[in-house]
From Swiss-Prot:
It is found in: Cytoplasm. This is Gamma-glutamyl phosphate reductase. Pathway: Amino-acid biosynthesis; L-proline biosynthesis; L-glutamate 5-semialdehyde from L-glutamate: step 2/2. The lineage of its organism: Bacteria, Pseudomonadati, Pseudomonadota, Alphaproteobacteria, Sphingomonadales. It holds the Pfam family Aldedh. PROSITE patterns: PROA. GO terms for molecular function: glutamate-5-semialdehyde dehydrogenase activity; NADP binding. Catalyzes the NADPH-dependent reduction of L-glutamate 5-phosphate into L-glutamate 5-semialdehyde and phosphate. The product spontaneously undergoes cyclization to form 1-pyrroline-5-carboxylate. It comes from Rhizorhabdus wittichii (strain DSM 6014 / CCUG 31198 / JCM 15750 / NBRC 105917 / EY 4224 / RW1) (Sphingomonas wittichii). Keywords: Amino-acid biosynthesis, Cytoplasm, NADP, Oxidoreductase, Proline biosynthesis. It catalyses: L-glutamate 5-semialdehyde + phosphate + NADP(+) = L-glutamyl 5-phosphate + NADPH + H(+). Belongs to the gamma-glutamyl phosphate reductase family. One of its GO terms (biological process) is L-proline biosynthetic process. It is an enzyme of class 1 (oxidoreductase). Its EC number is 1.2.1.41.
Length: 429
């Protein structure tokens, strides 16, 4: 019994390794073709895939209902079930997202800059695809469509490994993507879906040097941490979305109250949801903001000063300031002006998204320049931290690192560049 149990993980790893090696080789071949594919063909594939999403809507929603029922039976959190759930409106959003990506400018071949050297050499930097992208994600079936579309339009092949909780939904959406690819005459291996939920497949993807050029994880902290710790290929990711909203003393109450409620409560399970509210000690009416949040169904946890504002505020533990709740829970701290807010953010930030509400432009400019996050906002809900809202069509994820891409990663972020050097026989002396 003990010997059998010890062997099984090794066998699973071997099987998964062979599977990912085969998928990677086919993806690499597809990437070579995609790198030179005409823009019109890539756009056609996505437009036809959108049509297929709509034509297959009943089947996709039925598959999603199976996933949701299983998730509920397994006791998944309300936030995760919300991310998993598709309804007709959300599914139409998936289809519209494909069309939006198809309409975006093709980054492949774009000239970034050029210069003529004194010796006559013409140097040009042009955008080229990354190659093969591995996307590992949980819960959100829309990622199947978004990631597939962005990879394809940027000339990359992709290998998608969705979470077990969304298996039926992912397969149904992937089938629609394949309909579009076939209609455009592009290689079907351009968008592949890992057919197993075995966790060993994730390990095989993380070790697939030479087959996968970059890994993008989309999911919870444990998934992203595992990917960052174990990957032997580059990773584009964010670990946490500890998002702050700061209400300055010069904030307009007519903006501050609805912004605070929207930033937290519009959708609590997205990474752009505010998790910590910072209120300037000199702001005139903090009670209205806190009361509006409580009345909207938010559990508010605060420091001693915040608890003095409203007796419905619960005590905040030290860990609350570093917590991504992804739920109807918010921590509130009272700070001494913009300096206090920026100091708090510097201590607890995940460098994702932070925002200020103020009518004082110099204070806003100081915050925008001084906060080291991928997205910094002024008088806007943090829930706008989304590639679609940035006009990018969709996003493959939000990167909080400092190398390559930062913030919402869409078409341009899925390319690199190469140098073209044009000469007329120049010799180096």
């Amino acid at each position: 019994m003990t010997e059998t149990l010890a062997i099984r993980p090794t066998d699973a790893a071997k099987d998964s390794g062979a599977l990912i090696a085969d998928m990677g080789a086919r993806a690499r071949a597809a990437a070579v073709r995609l790198a030179g594919a005409p823009t019109a063909d890539k756009a056609k594939a996505l437009v036809e895939a959108a049509k297929a999403i709509r034509a297959r809507a009943a089947a996709i929603l039925a598959a999603n209902a199976e996933d949701v029922a299983r998730a509920q039976a397994n006791g998944l959190t309300a936030a995760m079930i919300d991310r998993l759930t598709l309804d007709p409106a959300r599914l139409e959003g998936v289809a519209a997202g494909l069309e939006a990506v198809a309409a975006l400018p093709d980054p492949v071949g774009q000239r970034i800059d050029e210069t003529r050297r004194p010796n006559g050499l013409l140097l040009q930097r042009v955008r080229v695809p990354l190659g093969v992208i591995g996307i590992i994600y949980e819960s959100r079936p829309n990622v199947t469509a978004d990631a597939g579309a962005l990879s394809l339009m940027s000339g990359n092949a992709c290998i998608l490994r969705g979470g077990s909780e969304a298996t039926a939904s992912n397969r149904a959406i992937h089938a629609a993507l394949l309909d579009g690819i076939r209609a455009a005459g592009l290689p079907e291996d351009a968008i592949q879906l890992v057919p197993t939920t075995d966790r060993a497949a994730v390990g095989a993807m993380l070790a697939a040097q030479g087959l996968i050029d970059i890994i993008v994880p989309r999911g919870g902290k444990s998934l992203v941490a595992r990917v960052q710790d174990e990957a032997r290929v580059p990773v584009l990711a964010h670990l946490d979305g500890i998002v702050h909203l700061y209400i300055d003393r010069a904030a307009d109450p007519a903006k501050a109250v609805p912004l605070a409620v929207n930033a937290k409560m519009r959708r609590t399970g997205v990474c752009g949801a505010t998790e910590t509210l910072l209120i300037d000690r000199a702001y005139g009416d903090p009670a209205t903001i806190v009361g509006a949040l409580v009345e909207a169904g938010c559990e508010v946890r605060g420091d001693a000063d915040a608890r003095a504002i409203d007796d419905r505020v619960l005590p905040a533990a030290d860990s609350d300031w570093d917590c991504e709740y992804l739920d109807s829970i918010l921590s509130v701290a009272i700070v001494d002006g913009v300096d206090g807010a920026m100091a708090h953010i510097a201590r607890h930030s995940s460098h994702h998204t932070d925002a200020i509400v103020t009518e004082d432009q110099p204070t806003a400019d100081r915050f925008l320049a001084g906060v080291d996050s991928a997205i910094v906002m002024h008088n806007a809900s943090t829930q706008f931290a989304d590639g679609g809202e940035f006009g990018l069509g969709a996003e493959i994820g939000i990167s909080t690192g400092r190398l390559h891409a930062r913030g919402p990663v869409a078409l341009e972020g899925l390319t690199t560049y190469k140098w073209l050097v044009r000469g007329e026989g120049q010799l180096r002396p």
